């Protein structure tokens, strides 16, 4: 496939040609999870091209297992002096599960710490000429069009100036279901085409039905246009990427014929609320330690986080077609967290999956409030728990299974931590209220005392805290060691103050998130589906009554736990106070952290600053400026009534409607489509028809040229016949 291959359907309606290029259909079959497909794994093109070093696995995974074994032994020794009771056995099991989880992150952090001490530099591939073609995909679902289209505009312009722009095509793949946003997208696309048609090829497609959500959106593109391209560079609606990063990914993929997927580690940007800036700071200071360590030891068995990554089209279409899981949601149906599964399937087929921890210039945004984080995590939690159905898949690499298990534990760890806390509380209350049985039924000259090894328990507590906070400590050490890094966040004093503030605020938020995740897990186990709601990305504020409703159970849980603790002693209450205060103040914490005003205050005084905030990359500055311009361009949105009234506007709209056939002859018609057909057929004028449509029906009409033509033929308003005769 060569760069010169670029024929599209030309039309005079749209500047720059048709909304989408010619289709070149290709197969992307759902993969079997119960048996290894024939021909897998493929033979590597380069000798040892997909082989990883065992020594790195031994250091991180082996180290985590050894550390966990030591901690579990010590915990058992704490209880074993006086004999282990059933409640203590339960606590030992819960401790083992939780410690193994944090030990792996700690050992990855050690590896990342020493790697970052050496300051790894990206491979110099900038001079490599690109002879492959890459489709850059920007999926969007009911997002603000000004954000999405302005980002594509500035990235496309920057890429065109590198001399490599000819090797890339841009695609905005819309799954938008809101008819008003759909029309705004079309307006924004016209502006985008005006700006970019001389230097870039930019396309737009909105699906009529968003089957299988984002994974289905990308799969639809692959089956219809994927064969035109060697690579797919997948972004998210809030993604930004520097041109050097885009070309660097394509060059790395081109240089490694065995690479199936290369994932960048995005930096968080554009946070305005306190919660968003907290996440930005934590991700910037501590995130590289974990991310670099992970990339170092997983090597060719990396992971995919759904965006800001480049994928070899052959590998993706040939190996990563997702099957539907048997049964109904939440555990059956479409695979929600598709990214981990796609990476595992690509690796199963014999392609490498690499985390490019040394490649900067990749950006994304984060939820602005605790509530928005909870909404996103509810969906992610369901998708990750769904991975329990994927774990037994035939032929997966053990590291891929570990990625899936890690994703599951990201949410199951909260119930396990809560159970551990409750078990410890029950042990304390048992010791306080239940009279010990000094002489048991078994004959003994000495009484049985309920004792623990308190010195060993305290030592184990310090070890556990060290393992838990180890990655944070590593990040702070790297920050303080690097003078340039420290200055980029406001200096060492501001950096230390920011770290202290982040630790305190995170400690207050952590118990709230623990209960949110526990609620999500319980909801999923009860069979409730998460649905798919669009994300808020800017303002995280909500009415106080809404926040009280959202956090009512968290506050109640805090009161009950506090009451149980004080029944034992004030000392126990003091020990539990860091977690309890967060629960008691859940509503004001949620309100304050979701506030832009408070976020701006901490920005002014330089707390939680990041290098990207203090000295943003040119691409980020241009994106903000372009977004303001796009907001001005589409401040007067089209309406369906205007489209029906204006023939030129109708032609523009139809030029952007997906050209896929509406429905094969003889196939069942969907209820909503049948209802719309009846409403259009019975309508006496456009005004009466539009008044009858709900939002779902209006979105369907916008995507159906036949219905639009039928509506266009109707009079704009109904005039009774007798009134016409009188006139």
UniProtKB/Swiss-Prot annotation:
Q: Which UniProt keywords apply?
A: Cell inner membrane, Cell membrane, Glycosyltransferase, Membrane, Transferase, Transmembrane, Transmembrane helix
The source's superkingdom equals Bacteria
Q: How does it sit in the membrane?
A: Multi-pass membrane protein
Query: Would I find Glycosyltransferase among this entry's keywords?
Result: yes
Residue ranges, annotated region (Disordered): 18-43
What is any one of the record's Gene Ontology cellular component terms?
plasma membrane
Q: What is its main location?
A: membrane
**Subcellular location per the Swiss-Prot or TrEMBL entry:** Cell inner membrane
Question: InterPro entries in the record, alphabetically?
Answer: Glucans_biosynth_gluTrFase_H, Glyco_trans_2-like, Glycosyltr_2/OpgH_subfam, Nucleotide-diphossugar_trans
Pathway linked to the protein: Glycan metabolism; osmoregulated periplasmic glucan (OPG) biosynthesis
BP GO terms, sorted: glucan biosynthetic process
Entry's EC annotation:
2.4.1.-
What Pfam families does the entry give?
Glyco_trans_2_3
Q: From the Swiss-Prot or TrEMBL record, what is one GO molecular function term?
A: hexosyltransferase activity
- Which residue ranges does UniProt annotate as crossing the membrane? 58-78, 90-110, 278-298, 408-428, 460-480, 496-516, 572-592
PANTHER family linked to this entry = CELLULOSE SYNTHASE CATALYTIC SUBUNIT A [UDP-FORMING], GLUCANS BIOSYNTHESIS GLUCOSYLTRANSFERASE H
Q: Member of which family?
A: Belongs to the glycosyltransferase 2 family. OpgH subfamily.
Task performed by this protein: Involved in the biosynthesis of osmoregulated periplasmic glucans (OPGs).
Q: What is this protein called?
A: Glucans biosynthesis glucosyltransferase H
**Native source organism of the sequence:** Shewanella sp. (strain MR-7)
**The organism's lineage?**
Bacteria, Pseudomonadati, Pseudomonadota, Gammaproteobacteria, Alteromonadales
